[in-house]
């Protein structure tokens, strides 16, 4: 059993090996990694998703600490996408994370 199978074996028991492989092959974009988006991105990483693109222009500030996963004393002033990307890599080292620090609008699509 390799590290990925050990790390995400619970997902395979829930969705089957085929389901886990679909998650591993998936690429998901999370637009906005604040209060809700950070939780969504972390849940995707913990589910074995193979690639995540994170999009957010904002930086972590002290007032985020009470509700945002990536908001810690040491991440204040850092780009939210960079702080979240680091957290995701610690959870799921095989996940390919692209961090885009920019504002999302119809021109970005």
Where are these regions (language model features)?
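Glycine-rich phosphate-binding loop and adjoining beta1-alpha1-beta2 segment
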Residues: 49-92
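Electropositive phosphate-/nucleotide-binding environments in soluble metabolic enzymes
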Residues: 5, 13, 17, 34, ...
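N-terminal charged helix/coil linker that caps or initiates catalytic domains
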Residues: 1-29
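Glycine-rich adenosine-cofactor-binding loop
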Residues: 24-45, 51-56
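Residues at or immediately flanking beta-strands
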Residues: 27, 96-98
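Rossmann-fold cofactor-recognition segment
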Residues: 71, 98-99
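Conserved SAM/SAH-binding loop
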Residues: 100-108
């Amino acid at each position: 059993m390799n590290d990925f199978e050990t790390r995400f074996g619970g997902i395979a028991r829930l969705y089957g090996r085929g389901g886990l492989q679909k998650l591993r092959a998936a690429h998901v974009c999370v637009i906005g990694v604040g209060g809700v988006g950070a939780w969504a991105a972390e849940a995707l990483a913990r589910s074995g998703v193979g690639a995540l693109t994170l999009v957010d222009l904002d930086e972590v500030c002290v007032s985020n600490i009470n509700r945002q996963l990536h908001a810690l004393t040491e991440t204040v002033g850092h780009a939210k996408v960079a702080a979240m990307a680091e957290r995701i890599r610690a959870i799921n080292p095989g996940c390919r994370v692209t961090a885009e620090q920019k504002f999302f609008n119809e021109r970005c699509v």
